[in-house]
Amino acid sequence: MSVISMKQLLEAGVHFGHQTRRWNPKMKKYIFVERNGIYIIDLQKTVKKLEEAYDFMRQVGQDGGKVLFVGTKKQAQEAIKDEAERSGNYYINQRWLGGTLTNFGTIQKRVARMKQIEKMEEEGTFEVLPKKEVIQLKKEHERLIKFLGGIRDMHDLPDVMFVVDPRKERIAVAEARKLNIPLVGIVDTNCDPDEIDYVIPANDDAIRAVKLLTAKMADALIESKQGEEEAPAVEAAAE
């Protein structure tokens, strides 16, 4: 059974690429036709590539791997957070802080600081501090949560990065590549597919398209866990 139907892709507008003047020639093999100055993505290829990415993600989940979902553009922020949380993984959906992966130790210190402020509040330290200092601490915490809340429990580098729009997230992509972290991505007609290991050629600007495809990646990870849960039950029944 197919991971996704052509109808679902069409309804979500996955086939709409960018204007023809804004394209990367390397995406030519994924383009079906040009219509009214816009490239239309070949959805048969999207289905095939999505299935490859799905199988890879499912294997990652089966191996106990962790995925960092990255998408900081407005159209991706909600889906990135929701689907990462739904599948028990990590996310960055605001600004990518340079060095998030390549300077991981420093980022971990910022996460520790975030948790320290939370502990101070829980233990009642805020009640004995000057009001001005408490306001500053709360502002600092808000900022840390905004940028690092999605990786607060990420104690090691991720096994895989899933990215929406590698062109926009080029710093994140460069860091992952430098560290040999495999990349899965929603790649529109203006992106360079060579930077991504598992390319999903698709519209990266429509909220519905981004949500649909990001959810499929989360589904693959969840499915891998369900398989693990079902296995002991099957073994018990066989005894």
From Swiss-Prot:
GO terms for molecular function: structural constituent of ribosome. Gene3D superfamilies: Glucose-6-phosphate isomerase like protein, domain 1 (3.40.50.10490), Helix hairpin bin (1.10.287.610). One of its GO terms (cellular component) is cytosolic small ribosomal subunit. One of its GO terms (biological process) is translation. Keywords: Ribonucleoprotein, Ribosomal protein. SUPFAM superfamilies: Ribosomal protein S2. HAMAP family: Ribosomal_uS2_B. Belongs to the universal ribosomal protein uS2 family. This is Small ribosomal subunit protein uS2.
